[in-house]
Amino acid sequence: MGCCIGSFLNVVIHRLPQKQSLVLPSSHCPHCGEAIAFYDNIPVLSYVLLRGKCRQCRAAISARYPLVEAMAGLLALALFRRYGFEPQFFIEFVFVVMLLAIAFIDLDTFLIPDVLSLSGLVIGLLASFLSIRLTWVDSLMGILIGGGFLYLIAIGYQYLRHQDGLGGGDIKLLGMIGAFLGVPG
């Protein structure tokens, strides 16, 4: 399951910054544009069997695809071993795959999409009602302290240096992290 989610994360990582649909067209080779058959779209395994190349044009496929799939699979396995199919598994899995998508998008574009960080913030707050680790008050405090702390740093830097030193995406991301993790201590 985790590797399949990782496969979808690759779609998100590749298409979201380009403002492309996450649903259509179906998976295709980034080089020749040929649609990828379902049997060539099995997470990690297809990459290995095809030796990292497109079946149609033989162009190399980035190793990032199986890396993201494997990372999502390993994270799912680790969380499942800890929580089983309890609500906390799903809460924390959503959190880590959102972080994974954000990390790779940020690596490519130096941008953190609001659609991920803000929806993650809301999901984290709502998930706190089901969480065994924190209450909704902890989650709300995490949002305010996490995002608020970076916001104050950004304002202070801008006041002192008369230029932006921190992007708004970082502030929203820390708010999202605070929503899922609450306030330490």
Which stretches of residues belong to each language-model region?
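Active-site-flanking alpha-helical
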Residues: I13, L79, I177
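Alpha-helical transmembrane segments of multipass membrane proteins
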Residues: I5-N10, A72, A76, A127, ...
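Transmembrane helix-loop-helix
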Residues: R81-I91
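Membrane-proximal soluble regions of multi-pass membrane proteins
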Residues: L9-R64
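Select subsegments of transmembrane alpha-helices in polytopic membrane proteins
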Residues: S62-V68, D114
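Membrane-helix interface segments
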Residues: F38-D40, A63, E86-P87, W136, ...
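Functional transmembrane core segments of multi-pass inner-membrane proteins
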Residues: F89-G185
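Hydrophobic alpha-helical transmembrane segments
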Residues: M1-C4, A76, F80-R81, L125-I132
